[in-house]
UniProtKB/Swiss-Prot annotation:
Its EC number is 2.4.1.18. The keyword Glycosyltransferase applies. This is 1,4-alpha-glucan branching enzyme GlgB. Pfam families: Alpha-amylase (PF00128), Alpha-amylase_C (PF02806), CBM_48 (PF02922), GlgB_N (PF22019). NCBIfam families: branching_enzym, PRK05402.1, PRK12313.1. It catalyses: Transfers a segment of a (1->4)-alpha-D-glucan chain to a primary hydroxy group in a similar glucan chain. Pathway: Glycan biosynthesis; glycogen biosynthesis. Catalyzes the formation of the alpha-1,6-glucosidic linkages in glycogen by scission of a 1,4-alpha-linked oligosaccharide from growing alpha-1,4-glucan chains and the subsequent attachment of the oligosaccharide to the alpha-1,6 position. The lineage of its organism: Bacteria, Pseudomonadati, Pseudomonadota, Gammaproteobacteria, Enterobacterales. InterPro entries: A-amylase/branching_C (IPR006048), Branching_enzy (IPR037439), GlgB (IPR006407), GlgB_N (IPR054169), GlgB_N_E_set_prok (IPR044143), Glyco_hydro_13_cat_dom (IPR006047), Glyco_hydro_13_N (IPR004193), Glyco_hydro_b (IPR013780). HAMAP family: GlgB (MF_00685). It comes from Yersinia pseudotuberculosis serotype I (strain IP32953). GO terms for cellular component: cytosol.
Length: 727
């Protein structure tokens, strides 16, 4: 190295356009001794201080009035630990030199990150509080392989990109820098000069905390500690366990009445946990809580995948929120969106001037329905970013399951595209092979590294093997939403009862494919928005019939094979559509004897009944666990089926979807005995007409429906009853 760097290099360094700052700045061993260079704009005087003894060794010479300093130590040949004593305006300040520290990434991390198989990329990329060579500070690392220069900017350096340019690791395109003295809570971003020479200010893709919109900076935040799973939580996710999910949007479940402001994570932990437990749900599912810029996206257009949104508090608050559910014996599911991201300038879009995280061709990389960008699943680093994020939420916050949004839009290249608007895969097909490989890898990794944690697919097509293991050609999900069942049964329920006999098969068709996947029956947020009306408002008839229809439908659903999901507000029959900008209509429950309270009591009892009786859940995915008893009585719109568990216990569900009571209705049954009526949706307790079977009934040795025994029943109008065979 020459005594004085080339003037052009100094100009580039000062102007923030030099891509290799470590080759100039810091201490370097030369043939003429040690050379120390520093770029300290606005500094009046700089001294080199030996850390070991605090002695001032030499004063650096100001070679350029814009802040470039240099010193030459001809008598010393070996590098040593040092600091700078800098005088800015008046008093001197002792500072560490970021450019005296060596490379941060280990070779194994560099290899795994480039390969896309690093299990925990969030432990290496992003911003991490640490101590290096006895000095406290923060290590920064960001992937931007096509950038000309990347700097860390923040409150600590006046957002000046000249002050802290980063080191490029050319083997993987990662820029890194350790900044001494930086503390938790400080704001930062990455200032990038992209491949076109344009300056971009980007939030950290791996930030653990971020500012709330409309601000866009990242915050220095410690990596959350590992949360271990438990045998009870793992068992609660099992295919043979009762799974009843309460789907919640945290920003509108309940709000402060005085200013309509959100409840915090801590406030929700006190109120929501108690309510979910009271209602008997086994799981709570949260609409996405990743940081997102637009409230109206409900979280489904996230930019800060690793940061819980600041709308409701800090990462520590969210972690305490999850822990409170676990203490109550309730598992937590997180809606996760690896399918697309918004094009906001501070986010992932054209991160280093190229289509880095997204596909370059808009026929692959632009989602025209949502005006968002689609991740490039063919890039190792992008797959690693996403797969690592899935594991992050489970390992660091104790999330028990992920529900993956819009899987169909990921696995089909022609999703919502006309002919000529999409690019076929390598073999000329419509499947996105890279996305399929990503989903298989992620699901398999979670299964191996986080046993008992599960994934759930919102997949709206008939793509085969969604819940089959990747090793035999499946996608590897544990559960799949049954969108077909939901649409068919809601269409049936919307029919006037007099016309239902013409649509009888809508309620039975789901059993023809019920065992092709591990299905969840969802009545989700998507069914109570965009003019679809509330579930209650879709029911036909006058007010009494609407509520009776809804109660009968819920009871039919809870008895049907498949796990259950219900969106908030539906449990007490909210009459209007969901509005994310205001609280649910809790005032509807003010009348304890009102219809809304009746529906709420029914859902609570359905959950407790569901959890109490194993026939309702244990063999959800075994054909032996279900038997039609009455499947073809379309004239009376009656359905009857039997649920069975592994020990032979049996429960019969019978639904009458007309307002006409059916007296002396005979149903054939496999085994005779006494059958106790354990639930009746027409009970007066639920504001029904209180017609039923006086608590139970004995079977008759009368052949019916191909069985030697039968029950002679009273079927209430627009109602479902459960009958449990007692040994």
């Amino acid at each position: 190295m020459s005594v004085l760097p080339d003037r052009q290099v100094i100009n580039q360094l000062i102007s923030g356009h030099y891509g290799d700052p470590f080759s100039i700045l810091g201490m370097h061993e030369t043939s003429q001794g040690l050379q120390i260079c520093a770029l300290l704009p606005d500094a009046r005087e700089v001294w080199l201080v030996e850390t070991e003894n605090g002695r001032r060794i030499a004063q650096l010479t100001l070679e350029d009035p814009r802040g470039f300093f240099i010193a030459q130590l001809t008598r010393r040949k070996k590098s040593f630990r040092y600091q700078f004593a800098v005088t800015w305006q008046e008093s001197p300040q002792i500072i560490e030199d970021p450019y005296r520290f060596g490379p941060l990434l280990q070779d194994i991390d560099s290899w795994l990150l480039a390969e896309g198989t690093h299990l925990r990329p969030y432990e290496r990329l992003g911003a991490h509080l640490m101590s290096l060579d006895g000095v406290s500070g923060v290590s920064f690392a960001v992937w931007a392989p096509n950038a000309q220069r990347v700097s860390v900017v923040g409150d600590f350096n006046f957002w000046d990109g000249r002050r802290h340019p980063m080191r490029l690791r050319r083997e993987n395109g990662i820029w890194e820098l350790f900044l001494p003295g930086i503390e938790a809570g400080q704001l930062y971003k990455f200032e990038i000069i992209d491949c076109h020479g344009q300056v971009r200010l980007k939030a950290d893709p791996y930030a653990f905390e971020a500012q709330m919109r409309p601000e866009t900076a990242s915050l220095i935040s410690p990596l959350p500690d590992v949360v271990k799973s438990s045998a009870a939580r793992q068992k609660a996710n099992d295919l043979c366990s009762p799974v009843s999910i309460y789907e919640v949007h945290l920003g509108s479940w309940r709000r402060h009445t005085d200013n309509n402001f959100w409840l915090s994570y801590r406030e929700l932990a006190d109120q929501l946990v108690e309510y979910v437990k009271y209602m008997g749900f086994t799981h709570v599912e949260l609409l996405p809580i990743n940081e997102h810029p637009f409230d109206g996206s409900w979280g489904y257009q996230p930019l800060g995948l690793y940061a819980p949104t600041r709308r409701y508090g800090t990462p520590e608050d969210f972690k305490a929120f999850v822990a409170k559910f676990h203490q109550a014996g309730i598992n937590v599911i997180l809606d996760w969106v690896p399918g697309h991201f918004p094009s906001d300038e501070h986010g992932l879009s054209t991160f280093d001037g190229t289509a880095l995280y997204e596909y370059a061709d808009p026929r692959e990389g632009y989602h025209q329905d949502w005006n968002t960008l689609i991740y490039n699943y063919g890039r190792n680093e992008v797959r690693n970013y996403l797969a690592g994020n899935a594991f992050y939420w489970m390992e660091r916050f104790g999330i028990d399951a992920l529900r993956i949004d819009a899987v169909a839009s990921m696995i089909y290249r022609d999703y919502s595209r006309a002919e000529g608007q999409w690019v076929p895969n390598y073999y000329g097909g419509r499947e996105n092979l890279e996305a399929i490989a990503f989903l298989r890898y992620t699901n398999k990794t979670i299964g191996v590294e986080r046993p008992g944690s599960v994934t759930m697919a919102e997949e709206s097509t008939d793509f085969p093997g969604v819940t089959l293991p990747p090793d035999i050609g499946g996608l590897g999900f544990n559960y799949k939403w049954n969108m077909g069942w939901m649409h068919d049964t809601l269409n049936y329920m919307q029919c006037d009862p007099v016309h239902r006999k013409y649509h009888h098969n809508l309620m039975t068709f789901g059993m023809l494919y019920a065992y092709t996947e591990n299905f969840i029956l969802p009545l989700s947020h998507d069914e109570v928005v965009h003019g679809k009306r509330s579930i209650l408002d879709r029911m036909p008839g006058d007010a009494w019939q609407k509520f009776a229809n809804l109660r009968a439908y819920y009871a039919f659903m809870w008895a049907h094979p498949g796990k259950k999901l219900l969106f908030m507000g539906c449990e007490f029959a909210q009459g209007r559509e969901w509005n994310f900008e205001t609280s649910l209509d809790w005032h509807l429950l003010d009348d304890e004897n009102g219809w809304h309270s009746g529906v709420q009591r029914l859902v609570r009892d359905l959950n407790h009944c569901y959890r109490q009786y194993a026939p309702l859940y244990e063999w959800d995915y075994q054909p032996a666990g279900f038997e039609w008893l009455v499947v073809d009585d379309h004239e009376n719109s009656v359905f009857a089926f039997l649920r069975r568990d592994a020990e032979g216990h049996e429960l019969i569900a019978i639904s009458n979807f007309t307002p006409v009571p059916r007296y002396h209705y005979r149903v054939g049954i496999p085994q005779g005995g006494h059958y106790r009526e354990v639930l009746n949706s027409d009970s007066a307790f639920y504001c029904g007409s209180n017609l039923g079977n006086q608590g139970g009934i004995d079977s008759h040795h009368v052949r019916s429906h191909n069985h030697e025994h039968s029950l002679l029943l009273t079927l209430p109008p627009l109602a479902t009853i459960y009958l449990l065979r007692e040994n």
